[in-house]
């Protein structure tokens, strides 16, 4: 197989791994932690996962010292935490 073919195969495998539904992967343990705004005084829009509703919810993140249940975007939150319906 040529090097171009190997690169294409590697790219397809990487894409497949990224697009694998969350149901076939374990949810990140931080997703079950309560939301924590952090201790700094910044006002950064962020998202946290709410297990009781299986949704990502927007909140204001202070910018530091929070737990892992905060994400820069709704998309990142859903990719890490949300269960498929």
Swiss-Prot record:
Claim: Acetylation is one of the keywords in the record: no
UniProt xrefs under SMART domains: KU
Signal peptide: 1-24
Tissue specificity field: Expressed by the venom gland.
Residue ranges of every copy of the BPTI/Kunitz inhibitor domain listed in the record: 31-81
Keyword Signal belongs to the record: yes
Top-level lineage group: Eukaryota
Transmembrane segments: none
Recorded GO MF terms: potassium channel regulator activity; serine-type endopeptidase inhibitor activity; toxin activity
InterPro entries from the UniProt entry: Kunitz_BPTI, Kunitz_BPTI_sf, Prtase_inh_Kunz-CS, TFPI/VKTCI-like
Keywords of this entry: Disulfide bond, Ion channel impairing toxin, Neurotoxin, Potassium channel impairing toxin, Presynaptic neurotoxin, Secreted, Signal, Toxin, Voltage-gated potassium channel impairing toxin
Location(s) in or outside the cell: Secreted
One Gene Ontology term, aspect cellular component: extracellular space
S-S bridge residues: 31-81, 40-64, 56-77
Quaternary structure note: Heterodimer; disulfide-linked. The A chains have phospholipase A2 activity and the B chains show homology with the basic protease inhibitors.
Family: Belongs to the venom Kunitz-type family.
Protein purpose: Beta-1-bungarotoxin is a presynaptic neurotoxin of the venom. The B chain is homologous to venom basic protease inhibitors but has no protease inhibitor activity and blocks voltage-gated potassium channels (Kv).
Protein name as annotated: Kunitz-type serine protease inhibitor homolog beta-bungarotoxin BF B2 chain
Source organism of the structure: Bungarus fasciatus
The organism's taxonomic lineage, starting at the top: Eukaryota, Metazoa, Chordata, Craniata, Vertebrata
């Amino acid at each position: 197989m040529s090097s171009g073919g190997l690169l294409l195969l590697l790219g397809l495998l990487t894409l497949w791994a990224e697009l694998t539904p969350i149901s076939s992967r374990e949810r990140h343990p931080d997703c079950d932690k309560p939301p924590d705004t952090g201790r700094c005084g910044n006002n950064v829009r962020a998202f946290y996962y709410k297990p009781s509703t299986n949704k990502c919810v927007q909140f204001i993140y202070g910018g530091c010292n929070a737990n892992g249940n905060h994400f820069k975007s709704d998309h990142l939150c859903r990719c890490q935490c949300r269960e498929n319906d």
